[in-house]
Curated annotation (Swiss-Prot):
This is tRNA-specific 2-thiouridylase MnmA. CDD domains: MnmA_TRMU-like. It is an enzyme of class 2 (transferase). It comes from Thermotoga maritima (strain ATCC 43589 / DSM 3109 / JCM 10099 / NBRC 100826 / MSB8). PANTHER family: MITOCHONDRIAL TRNA-SPECIFIC 2-THIOURIDYLASE 1, TRNA 5-METHYLAMINOMETHYL-2-THIOURIDYLATE -METHYLTRANSFERASE. Signal peptide: none annotated. GO terms for molecular function: ATP binding; tRNA binding; tRNA-uridine 2-sulfurtransferase activity. InterPro entries: MnmA-like, MnmA-like_C, MnmA-like_central, MnmA-like_central_sf, Rossmann-like_a/b/a_fold.
Length: 358
């Protein structure tokens, strides 16, 4: 089989490439360039991020070592259009966007995958910790969680188009991270011990404030208020805060522990409250993408953030919205994040959280 592999320059995609070669596939590597090299050179990189010049160098070295052709694909324009600009808009709307999920849908498993398939490849592969398997229950191939639940990345794949699943391969999904590193080490791949990417690739210094400043937006301090309207402190720019956060702002009224309850962008206000007020009985989400056919109402488990606990829930689907009712209240349901829906370890799809229901 002819397989195009997204090669980031990290150990996961390197091992995915290696495993496919071992299986006898005809393989070519594709490496995305999301930003100009100068962008990373000018920034202080506090955490390991993907798509930097060093990643490009590593990807080329991996491909050369494994004896495969590599092509550098310029995705800067589509990346700005589909990831950076929406991220910026959503921050200013008071949302907490998920750029990695948008990148997966529109860039990696959108533009890049189309680019690969249009070259005549049979399938597209990456180093994601997830599995592609045929489901007897749903009568089609589905995405399942990776066996290493600590590294499972299925959440970030919740909104990719369902037809693409038939053409995807995730070789790493049946391994743990430790096993992947061991395979790389035994194969002599030089990135076997390379640090994992930790942050948003286009914010290498980890500062949303600096990102917005680079985009021509200066944040303004504002009031922190209670739901009753009492001013209890000051914030440093509402886009810096997310639901459930309890640090990073200046509280002038002591004696209580405050958590971010919400934001009012048009008034430049952050609303805080007690811990119990940031637990939610449900949510409304919009623009759902379903990988399988689902009824108008069904039971499943829902994940509202990558590291959140899965919550048993009843889901009601109506037109372009989804109403989710949890069995037990869930912490910090955050507008802009992805609600991913599972049947056991099978990913059913995902939607963008519009609002939490208390």
């Amino acid at each position: 089989m002819k397989v195009g592999v997204a090669l980031s320059g990290g150990v996961d995609s390197a091992v995915a490439l290696y495993l496919l070669l071992k299986e006898g596939h005809e393989v070519k590597a594709f490496h995305m360039k999301t930003k100009e090299d100068e962008f990373f050179i000018k920034k202080e990189i506090k955490k390991k991020v993907c798509c930097s010049p060093s990643d490009t160098a590593d990807a080329m070295r991996i491909a050369h070592f494994l004896g495969v052709e590599i092509e550098i694909v310029d995705v800067k324009e589509i990346f700005r259009e589909k990831v950076i600009e929406p991220f910026k808009r959503d921050l200013l709307k008071g949302l907490t966007p998920n750029p990695c999920a948008h990148c997966n849908r529109f860039v990696k498993f959108g533009y890049l995958m189309d680019y690969v398939l249009n070259q005549g490849f049979d399938a597209f592969a990456s180093g994601h910790y997830a599995r592609i398997e045929f489901s007897e229950k749903y009568g089609r191939k589905v995405i399942k969680k990776g066996v290493d639940l600590k590294k499972d990345q299925s959440y970030f794949l919740a909104r990719i188009e369902p037809w693409r699943i038939e053409r995807l391969i995730f070789p790493n999904g049946i391994y743990t991270k430790e096993e992947i590193r061991k395979i790389a080490e035994e194969a002599g791949i030089h990135v076997a011990k390379k640090q994992e990417s930790q942050d948003v690739c286009f914010i290498p210094d980890g500062s949303i404030e600096n990102f917005l400043k680079d985009e021509g937006i200066t944040l303004k301090d504002g009031d922190i208020i209670t739901p009753e309207g009492e001013v209890v402190g000051r914030h440093f720019g509402y886009p810096l805060y997310t639901i459930g956060q309890r640090k990073g702002f200046k509280i002038e009224k002591f004696g209580r522990r405050y958590y971010v309850r919400g934001k009012i962008p048009e008034k430049n206000v952050v609303v805080v409250s007690d811990l119990e007020d940031v637990f939610f009985s449900g949510l409304i989400a919009e623009d759902p993408v379903w990988h399988v056919e689902v009824p108008e109402e069904f039971r499943c488990v829902c994940r509202v953030r990558k590291k959140s606990e899965e919550a048993p829930a009843v889901v009601k689907v109506k037109d372009n919205e989804v109403e989710v009712s949890f069995e037990k209240k869930v912490f910090a349901v955050t507008p802009g994040q992805i609600a991913a829906f599972y049947d056991g370890d099978t990913l059913l799809g995902g939607a963008i959280i519009k609002e939490g229901i208390r």
